[in-house]
Swiss-Prot record:
Residues 30-57 are intravirion. Residues 1-8 are virion surface. This is Small hydrophobic protein. The gene is SH. Interacts with host TNFRSF1A, RIPK1 and IRAK1; these interactions interfere with host NF-kappa-B activation at the level of receptor complexes. Interacts with host protein UBQLN4.
Length: 57
């Protein structure tokens, strides 16, 4: 009976690896989008970004 049950440790390790890959992928995408957004804001939304920052405080 125990032979039918899949080993828990390798599946757990695979899950951790998968989650790490997913988090890294999301982090890279978010940083890239943030950098592009900041670049665009600094290019043609300088006054608007300053106004939003002043009103957010």
């Amino acid at each position: 009976m125990p032979a039918i049950q899949p080993p828990l440790y390798p599946t757990f390790l695979l899950l951790i690896l998968l989650s790490l890959i997913i988090t890294l992928y999301v982090w890279i995408i978010s940083t890239i989008t943030y950098k592009t957004a900041v670049r665009h804001a600094s290019l043609y939304q300088r006054s608007f970004s300053r106004w939003s920052f002043d009103h957010s405080l």
